[in-house]
Design a protein with these regions (language model features):
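Class I S-adenosyl-L-methionine
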Residues: 1-148
Length: 148
């Protein structure tokens, strides 16, 4: 069993590709890609359980009380915040559907291309996290580089 957080020996890479890295494994891979200054990141997330366990918002409770809807909202928020963190770190990020839903419901691709221009979205990220009561692993990993 391996863990990308333990992977060393590479200083810089051109492209990082992740496919269905479960839950926070995607976050560890994205943080590693940012640390390596990857020129391109292509990430197809899998399950997004972390924020499903955390998300709380009194105004959204009438919707969040339904498990299926909470799961879907949590998945979308997770991937949206991932894209925002990548933009903060100097990437142009897009979220795309890469295959028809009839083939798999896990059809979201986060595509990020390094621009070197750091985003000015830190406050927006923090407000979103605070409003939803979430603390994504990717944010922590990027804010504490070298501590993992």
């Amino acid at each position: 069993e391996g863990n990308i957080a333990d992977y060393t020996g590479v200083d810089e890479v051109d492209m990082v590709v992740t496919l269905h890295a479960c839950d926070t494994a995607t976050d560890f891979a994205l943080a590693k890609a940012v640390h390596w200054n990857a020129k391109v990141i292509l990430s197809v997330p899998c399950c997004q359980h972390e924020l499903n366990r955390q998300i709380k918002n009194e105004d959204l409770e009438p919707v969040l009380k339904y498990g299926l809807l909470k799961e879907r909202i949590s998945a979308l928020v997770t991937d949206g915040l991932r894209a925002q963190y990548l933009e903060r770190e100097g990437y142009e990020a897009q979220i795309l559907e890469f295959i028809d839903m009839e083939h798999t419901p896990k059809n979201i691709l986060i595509r990020a291309v390094r621009t070197g221009r750091k985003g000015e979205n830190e406050d927006a990220i923090r407000r979103c996290e605070q409003a939803l009561g979430v603390a994504p692993t990717l944010g922590w990993l990027l804010d504490h580089e070298g501590e993992v």
